[in-house]
């Protein structure tokens, strides 16, 4: 399918397809959530999360959970799912996983963890999406 490494735009398109196909019990949390793709996580993000290996981070949900929002948050930045292109592509190469499925599972994982879903719940959501 790809004769060259997928671009940022390719990953954005896959993530948008993933959001459109995400299981309903997770989709209800996603009103107004954006998608951003960066090549690699920056040092500040890695430090904030306590992650030493930048290649280990494929995505991150940045935002405020719905239950923690207040009327005073009107001017806050919109929530965004950040996908890290190069770590995703490395995992894609190493595992042979379908790229859409890999991106979809990163999106599901980030959203679900942000909203407090357990690892078992996340595995169930990934199965539902298949």
PLM segments and residue spans:
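Catalytic glutamate of the conserved HExxH
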Residues: 106, 110-114
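Active-site rim/adjacent substrate-binding subdomains
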Residues: 1-102, 114, 118-124, 129
């Amino acid at each position: 399918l790809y004769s060259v490494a997928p671009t940022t735009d390719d990953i954005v398109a896959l993530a948008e397809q993933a959001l459109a196909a995400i299981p309903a019990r997770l989709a209800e949390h996603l009103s107004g959530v954006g998608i951003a793709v960066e090549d690699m996580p920056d040092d500040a993000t890695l430090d904030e999360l306590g992650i030493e290996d930048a290649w280990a981070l494929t995505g991150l949900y940045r935002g405020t959970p719905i239950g923690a929002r207040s009327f005073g948050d009107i001017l806050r930045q919109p929530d965004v799912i950040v996908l890290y292109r190069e770590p995703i592509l490395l995992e894609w190469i190493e595992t042979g996983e379908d790229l859409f499925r890999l991106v979809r599972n990163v999106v599901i994982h980030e959203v679900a963890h942000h909203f407090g879903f357990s690892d078992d719940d996340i595995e169930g959501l990934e199965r539902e999406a298949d």
